Amino acid sequence: MIQMQTVLEVADNSGARKVMCIKVLGGSHRRYARVGDVIKVGVKDAIPRSKVKKGAVMRAVVVRTAQGVRRDDGSLIRFDDNAAVLLNNQNEPIGTRIFGPVTRELRERFMKIISLAAEVL
């Protein structure tokens, strides 16, 4: 469950390390984002000479949450961290590699992230 001021890890090679959620997109007063939701983030930490600079405001999709994802069969998939993948304005990932596992719930809207990920749960 991601809300404003939540700090997330970045799960791609765009150059950002940590981002902070500044807005949950998709509704006028939407409070929480789950896996697969698009959020607006500010870059808090980035590696030098990368595609993304510290202070940049970007879009991101949530790929892992510590709260987890409840499946239709009743199973719950939880992760150790909250992580996101940075997107451009066309909702395509900026990075060319995805680190760590992602969930099947991204398949409908973000097939490119599924194909780049090493492990899909």
Curated annotation (Swiss-Prot):
Q: Name one GO molecular function term.
A: structural constituent of ribosome
A single Gene Ontology CC term: cytosolic large ribosomal subunit
Recorded hits in SMART domains, A to Z, give: Ribosomal_L14 (SM01374)
Identify the keywords attached in UniProt to this record, alphabetized: Ribonucleoprotein, Ribosomal protein, RNA-binding, rRNA-binding
Q: Which residues cross the membrane?
A: none
- CDD domains in the record, alphabetically? Ribosomal_uL14
Return the InterPro entries for the record: Ribosomal_uL14, Ribosomal_uL14_bac-type, Ribosomal_uL14_CS, Ribosomal_uL14_sf
Can you supply a Gene Ontology BP term from the record?
A: translation
The UniProt entry, under SUPFAM superfamilies, shows: Ribosomal protein L14
Alphabetical list of Pfam families matching this protein: Ribosomal_L14
The family classification in the record reads: Belongs to the universal ribosomal protein uL14 family.
- What does the subunit comment say? Part of the 50S ribosomal subunit. Forms a cluster with proteins L3 and L19. In the 70S ribosome, L14 and L19 interact and together make contacts with the 16S rRNA in bridges B5 and B8.
Q: What job does the chain carry out?
A: Binds to 23S rRNA. Forms part of two intersubunit bridges in the 70S ribosome.
> What protein name is recorded for this chain?
Large ribosomal subunit protein uL14
Native source organism of the sequence: Legionella pneumophila (strain Corby)
Q: Which gene encodes it?
A: rplN
